[in-house]
């Protein structure tokens, strides 16, 4: 038998001709954290079932890697969808609704089925049988027509419709012991390593809980974010009422000439929600003096703040917008991270004593000189920007630390109204493939950065992990402290953003480190029909990203 040598994780290894990545991975299980889920050669990811065809260096990824963790999740999903199909047949529609603290909330659409512990035990028991059997998960390439027939036979009309809009003539399905499913993204080679998971009854369905990426032998902690969950469930119900629950149904609105109506209904819903939040503030006007708005990157915070101020004025409340950016400490006092890099997202990067002192004076009705931060010199300046807030007027602050009480520690709790904003999309690719809220925000940011900040997509992707790490530390731990939550996602936006994002993503070469993410996003956007944004109103949050906003954003 012919053999050859390749460099695997820094070690020269002799492999047999025709060996797969899985064959080699068995000998390197101790080199990563948790089970190996994925391989990499040069700048391309490889599924473990694939044969090693080149002599390029090989790197293996365990679930501490985000791409490998996605593979693990999809592997557990096919265990679950097969189990439900085997237990109750094609009339039991399984829907993966959304992510909740990196767990997946799912429902089984079978009217007479109650999600009891007994039902969940049956599903999980089947799943663990498949794991114990170490069954292969096989990629099957077939004609689109054959894939649609399998989808219909297995009671998956969503996939049948999704494939209808697919441009390619072939489709890759994954087979697990005679059961077929479709997943957008890489899959495990077999079921044997998918040992750590659990099903937990939740709301009207159940959560699939996954391992902690840093400690893959145990489940990730779950703190039950009830406020965030209620927003997702409300959006899910609204999508069902609209008849646009997945990409195929969104594409259908385009082909039927109803896309403009969808835009107008989405925007009306946003306006209604913003008005409701303004009403909540108005009801507490005897105490509330400061409104704090916080949310992750590309949530549309600036446009939301402007629209909220308009709704407050409708109620006779005069708002005063204050930028937290103007309260940065001078550059030489900015905290640094472990690499010696200035960390502008650390709460101590803000002059908290000055901010609290100014807020107390404004609440007391004093005339206050507001600082302006000069980003060129890194110094604070005073340029005659003054505010004197009268009784009944509101101070509006927008920034990433708005929900953290440390920011406004000297302001009494009853004087503060906290708002969390994020793009929590409820639209799915199909019933088993959710759309990542993080990916949706990344696409927004790619479009905005290129349009208005002179950054190409590679630079945006390069810094995205730092952005999301900062959000995990500074924003998400405090989201349940919010008095109100605004979901800035729109059902229609990815059809519009597609035409702006795709050229930037295609510009990223295969030799660039950002290519892996770009390739994934290109494939994702390929599910959508492109739509013009001509009917989007100029006060829409989406205009903050594509241009044409009536606000200074």
Regions found by a protein language model. Name each.
Residues 314-332:
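Short beta-strand-centered segment that lines the nucleotide-binding/catalytic pocket of NTP-utilizing
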Residues 50-69, 83, 92-101, 105-272, ...:
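Auxiliary tRNA-acceptor-end handling modules of aminoacyl-tRNA synthetases
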Residues 356-414, 464-478:
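Glycine-rich phosphate-binding loop used to anchor ATP phosphates in small-molecule kinases
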Residues 329, 333-376:
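Conserved nucleotide-sensing/catalytic segment adjacent to the nucleotide-binding pocket
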Residues 291-293:
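Hydrophobic anchor at the beta1->P-loop junction of P-loop NTPases
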Residues 408-553:
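Conserved NTP phosphate-binding and transfer environment spanning the P-loop NTPase/kinase superfamily
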């Amino acid at each position: 038998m012919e053999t050859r040598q390749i460099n695997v994780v820094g070690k020269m290894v002799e492999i047999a001709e025709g060996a797969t990545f899985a064959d080699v991975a068995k000998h390197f299980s101790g080199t990563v954290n948790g089970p190996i889920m994925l391989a990499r050669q040069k700048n391309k990811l490889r599924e473990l079932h694939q044969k090693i065809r080149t002599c390029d260096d090989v790197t293996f990824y365990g679930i501490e890697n985000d791409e490998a963790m996605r593979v693990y999740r999809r592997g557990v999903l096919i265990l679950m969808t097969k189990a439900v199909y085997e237990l109750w047949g094609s009339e039991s529609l399984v829907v993966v609704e959304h992510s909740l603290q990196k767990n997946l909330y799912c429902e089984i659409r079978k009217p007479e089925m109650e999600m009891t512990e007994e039902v969940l035990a049956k599903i999980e028991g089947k799943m663990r049988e498949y794991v114990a059997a170490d069954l292969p998960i096989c990629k099957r390439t077939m004609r689109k027509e054959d894939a649609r027939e399998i989808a219909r036979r297995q009671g998956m009309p969503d996939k049948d419709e999704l494939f209808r809009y697919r441009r390619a003539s072939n489709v890759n399905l994954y087979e697990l012991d005679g059961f077929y499913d479709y997943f957008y993204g890489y899959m495990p080679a077999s079921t044997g390593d998918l040992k750590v998971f659990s099903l937990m009854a939740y709301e009207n369905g159940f959560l699939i809980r996954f391992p902690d990426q840093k400690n893959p032998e145990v489940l990730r902690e779950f703190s039950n974010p009830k406020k965030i969950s209620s927003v997702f469930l409300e959006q899910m119900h609204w999508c069902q009422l609209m008849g646009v629950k997945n990409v195929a149904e969104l594409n259908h609105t385009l082909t039927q000439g109803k896309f403009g109506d969808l835009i107008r209904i989405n925007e009306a819903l946003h306006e209604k929600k913003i008005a409701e939040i303004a009403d909540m503030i108005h009801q507490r006007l005897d105490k509330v003096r400061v409104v704090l708005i916080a949310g992750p990157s590309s949530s549309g915070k600036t446009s939301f703040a402007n629209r909220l101020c308009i709704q407050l004025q409708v109620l006779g409340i005069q708002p005063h917008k204050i930028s937290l950016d103007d309260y940065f400490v001078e550059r030489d006092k900015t905290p640094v991270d472990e690499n010696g890099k200035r960390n502008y997202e650390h709460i101590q990067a803000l002059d908290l004593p000055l901010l609290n002192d100014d807020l107390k004076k404004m609440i007391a009705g004093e005339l206050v000189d507001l600082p302006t931060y000069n980003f060129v010199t890194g110094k604070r300046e005073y340029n005659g920007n003054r505010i004197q807030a009268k009784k009944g007027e509101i101070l509006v602050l927008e920034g990433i630390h708005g929900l953290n009480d440390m920011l406004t520690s000297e302001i009494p709790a009853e004087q503060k109204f906290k708002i969390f904003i994020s793009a929590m999309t409820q639209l799915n690719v199909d019933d088993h493939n959710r759309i990542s809220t993080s990916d949706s925000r990344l696409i927004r940011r790619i479009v905005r950065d290129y349009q208005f900040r002179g950054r190409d997509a590679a630079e945006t992707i390069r810094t995205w992990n730092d952005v999301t790490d900062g959000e995990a530390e500074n924003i998400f731990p405090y989201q349940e402290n919010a008095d109100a939550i605004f979901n800035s996602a729109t059902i229609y936006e990815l059809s519009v953003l597609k035409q702006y994002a795709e050229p930037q993503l295609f510009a990223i070469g295969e030799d660039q480190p950002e290519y892996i993410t770009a390739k994934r996003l290109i494939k994702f956007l390929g599910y959508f029909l492109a739509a013009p944004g001509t009917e989007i109103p100029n006060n829409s949050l989406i205009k903050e990203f594509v241009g044409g906003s009536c606000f200074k954003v």
